[in-house]
């Protein structure tokens, strides 16, 4: 309600509150020098003197989720090397699930060498950090198990029986794990620690596989690979509240990422050769932004300004600038390749991607796109996890952190 001349006290209070709000909101807006150096750019605004503080008044998040640090940047907690005390002591590693070899290759990112090979269940698809960031879950899809790995020791624990775990996510409040049961055509909400089934949500689309959550955590968008559809799911109610067919014949949507400001969702499509851009709130008709052949994985830079888009069918990575709302660069892998899923190093300087059909892993310089390493691994490497990474908690997949 706007103040009136008769309510000077209210006016004064409102102005003071507004000033405090602006000051708080501004805390998380700038990028650190390390991130700019990692990407070879200069900051558009001076870096803040103090770390971001929660702005509780503006975002009414999913009950129980940690407060949003900056309503203008959902990735505000993911700045270079800002590791949580929970993960700070973990050795830096790259965990590569080899789908056709039933193993996980463990790479030391400093030497680019494989230091361990872990035998897991049948057809491991993704390595997923748990919500509390204490465990890495290997999704053994056809083996119907999840293998826990202790990121502190690198040792695998006893597999947990979970049917059809193609991919795995966690609700922002940490209350549930969400299994993308692709062949079962289900979203299965489970206990995030024991993986006990709590609720099963049948879906009418085919091939649920990737997702991301809204800024407030109250809903998430899911891609259905084999029927070319998208779902909108109410997180708290655990209910599908929207469904649409992508406007492209033969569409095969893959990875999903929300924009830093939470206003748009991007969905990679390997058959449409680009990203669908969607307003998640309205869940209206999306538009297609071409990127390259076989568009697959989407990864955010440590300063939240760019997104790295892997084009598996042509061996390239496109760079999308959120502020300019356009593609600014394209990096081509020397000798080709099949860049698929991966993640960004904790310092933001290296993009790691699996070479799905080449039995290899690529390490790329995020400033120049230069290939730093090409490492032979097992057969069918897929959703590799770079770990640890900055953030307060994990939403799953190969590492979506808030």
Predicted features, each with a name:
Residues 14-25:
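Bacterial N-terminal signal peptides
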Residues 27-402:
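Predominantly soluble domains enriched in secretory-pathway, periplasmic, or organellar proteins
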Residues 2-15:
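Bacterial N-terminal signal peptides that target proteins for export
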């Amino acid at each position: 309600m706007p103040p009136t001349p008769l309510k000077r006290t209210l006016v004064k209070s409102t102005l003071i509150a507004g000033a405090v709000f602006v000051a708080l909101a501004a805390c998380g807006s700038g990028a650190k020098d390390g991130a700019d150096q990692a990407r070879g750019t200069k900051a558009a605004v001076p870096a803040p003197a103090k770390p971001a503080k929660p702005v509780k008044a503006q975002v009414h998040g999913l009950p129980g989720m940690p407060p949003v640090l900056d309503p203008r940047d959902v990735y505000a907690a993911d700045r270079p090397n800002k590791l949580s005390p929970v993960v700070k002591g973990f050795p830096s590693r790259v965990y590569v699930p080899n789908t056709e070899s039933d193993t996980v290759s463990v790479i030391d990112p400093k030497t680019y060498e494989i230091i361990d090979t872990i035998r897991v269940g049948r057809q491991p698809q993704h390595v997923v950090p748990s919500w509390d960031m204490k465990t890495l879950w290997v999704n053994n899809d056809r083996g119907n198990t999840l293998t826990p790995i202790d990121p502190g020791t690198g040792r695998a624990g006893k597999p947990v029986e979970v049917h059809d775990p193609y991919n795995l996510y966690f609700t922002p409040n940490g209350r549930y794990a969400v299994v993308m049961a692709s062949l079962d055509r289900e979203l299965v909400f489970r206990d995030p620690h024991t993986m006990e089934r709590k609720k099963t949500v049948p879906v009418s689309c085919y091939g649920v596989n990737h997702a991301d959550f809204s800024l407030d955590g109250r809903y998430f968008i899911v891609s259905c690979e084999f029927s070319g559809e998208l779902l909108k799911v109410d997180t708290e109610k655990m209910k599908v509240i929207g469904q649409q067919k992508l406007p492209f014949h033969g569409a095969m949507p893959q990875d999903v990422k929300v924009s830093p400001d939470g206003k748009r969702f991007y969905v990679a499509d390997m058959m449409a050769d680009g990203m669908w851009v969607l307003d998640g709130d309205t869940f209206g008709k999306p538009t297609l932004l071409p990127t390259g052949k076989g568009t697959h994985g989407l990864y955010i830079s440590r300063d939240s300004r760019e997104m790295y888009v892997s084009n598996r069918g042509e061996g390239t990575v496109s760079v999308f600038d959120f502020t300019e709302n356009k593609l600014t660069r394209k990096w081509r892998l020397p000798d080709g390749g099949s860049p698929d899923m991966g993640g960004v190093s904790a310092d933001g300087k290296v993009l790691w991607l699996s070479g799905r059909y080449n039995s290899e892993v690529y390490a790329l310089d995020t400033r120049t796109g230069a290939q730093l390493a090409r490492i032979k691994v097992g057969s069918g490497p897929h959703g590799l996890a770079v770990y640890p990474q900055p953030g307060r908690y994990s939403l799953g997949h190969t590492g979506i952190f808030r």
